[in-house]
Amino acid sequence: MATLATIDLRSDTVTRPTAAMRAAMAEAPVGDDQYGEDPTSNLLQARCAELLGKEGALWLPSGTMANQVALRVLTRPGDEVIVSRECHAGWHETGGSAANAGVQLIEVGDRGVFTAAEFEAAIKTRAMPVYAPSTLVEIENTHNRSGGIVFPQDEVVRICALARKRGLASFLDGARLWNASVASGRSEADLAAPFDLVAVSFSKGLGAPGGSVLAGSKELIVAATRHRRMLGGAMRQVGILAAAAIFGLDHHRERLAEDHAHARLLAETLAGSPAVRLDLSSVQTNIVVFHLAAGAPDAGALVARARERGVLLNAFGVRTVRAVTHLDVTREQTERAATVLRELLD
């Protein structure tokens, strides 16, 4: 008897390049990117600068490196960075913010979001020499560990205006900014406008095998180029990967709404179980983070049992589980995954 294909909801990073994306990669004209001679990389950088409303952009091999380069460009060792609670830079980059940039992160807010008032309260006074100077505010949009929540743009504008007034730089970790744009109906340029530097990723919802871009002023991009080299991220014929990113921008950006609908379907099914605690208002894009009630299996047990039934998930804590919809998961597969999880929980 034929077995059903595995449904991988661990992350949107598990997507595989489509046949058409692979063809675009194979046909991409390339050159030495460190000499500025890779035409496909140059095209991607120019396009992203325009999409994000910035003067320039720089390709990097990963979102983590983009974040780390941004920290090095916008801070000095010993500085303090104000971030959202459970941000990627603090929870998923193996201490890189301390090791690479020499900064400490101060988490504020709740569920991936904070207010301008909370931000201002976290800024250390420079009159006290015992404090690390607050020099940067970082916002993650959408916010991974908070279930793909979209940071309210009105609050973003207030926070970044206050940062400028108080002499702090601003950075947007927009690894999933494409999702935020689709969910909010705002352009990427609008979402990125208040920030000094912006990072976006191509290896998640857009389905490319790797790559991110930093965008900002020409001066900041020159500095980022130096730090990219310092961290080992400067590559040669990167047009092969840049072509995948361009293909994703052309063909996979608008369809992100399908992923969002699939996540909503999954969340609504799970929310009907007494074993699940899930605030449906938090399910705004393609990530579903749910909590297991007392008496239900713990996260590790549920993940193991789901795997036996062909559904892959991630445990995000003792009683917290994450599921992520993406390019490689159909509506039918989402429905099957939801059915499997309800059977395991009820």
What do these predicted regions represent?
Residues 2-309, 313-329, 333-345:
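Conserved PLP-enzyme active-site core in the AAT-like
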